[in-house]
Design a protein with these regions (language model features):
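Non-catalytic C-terminal accessory region of glycerolipid acyltransferases
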Residues: 3, 23, 27, 60-177
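Catalytic core of membrane glycerolipid acyltransferases/transacylases, capturing the structured
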Residues: 2-60, 86-92, 96-98, 111
């Protein structure tokens, strides 16, 4: 059985996905953005790793270590809807161009892992419902964004719009925020 790449977006509580995947898999590596408040970050880090997920900060060294584990056939979870600090590509998101993380595209091209889109939407009896879709093994960033759009349209109020997806535009475009 192949290891897995899970990509997700900030919709509902992403930490629930860490807990669910940690419960279902013997191992999961998670790329995340550390909280700016150090006290809060230390507590969140411990809670997230308690279930068995291994956390890697979205820094050059964190991505490098995650990639090393990826090459060793570890399972990976990436919330890939955030705006990258440096490396990325411009793609459409709800018909507007924005700067996007292309890590899932790069990892999926290796063909070593099964690819899944996992996210939370509104539940009927419970607050959230986990949705997991197996995807073809190679995906482009544009295709990934389309999956995000479809998920958001199921419950737009659950998406974390405050991450300002359109804040990093091409140099000749003005910031809309």
């Amino acid at each position: 059985q192949k290891p897995k790449i899970f990509f997700t977006l900030h919709m509902g509580c992403v930490d629930i996905l860490i807990f669910v995947l940690s419960e279902l898999l013997s191992q999961i590596d998670v790329l995340y953005t550390p909280a700016k408040n150090k006290t809060l970050e230390n507590k969140l880090f411990k809670i997230r790793q308690r279930q068995g997920g291994k956390m890697f900060p979205a820094t050059p060294s964190g991505v490098k270590n995650l990639f090393r584990n990826f090459l060793n056939k570890n399972n990976v979870l990436i919330a890939s809807d955030l705006v990258p600090h440096e490396k990325g590509v411009y793609e459409k998101f709800f018909d507007k161009e924005c700067f996007c993380i292309d890590l899932v595209e790069k990892l999926s091209k290796k063909g070593t892992h099964d690819l899944h889109f996992i996210y939370l939407t509104k539940g009927e009896q419970k607050k959230y419902k986990v949705v997991c879709k197996k995807i073809k093994n190679k995906i482009t960033t544009a295709e990934m964004n389309k999956y995000f759009e479809d998920a958001i349209l199921t419950a737009p109020e659950l998406y974390y719009w405050e991450y300002k997806k359109f804040r990093k535009l091409r140099p000749n475009k003005s910031n809309i925020y």
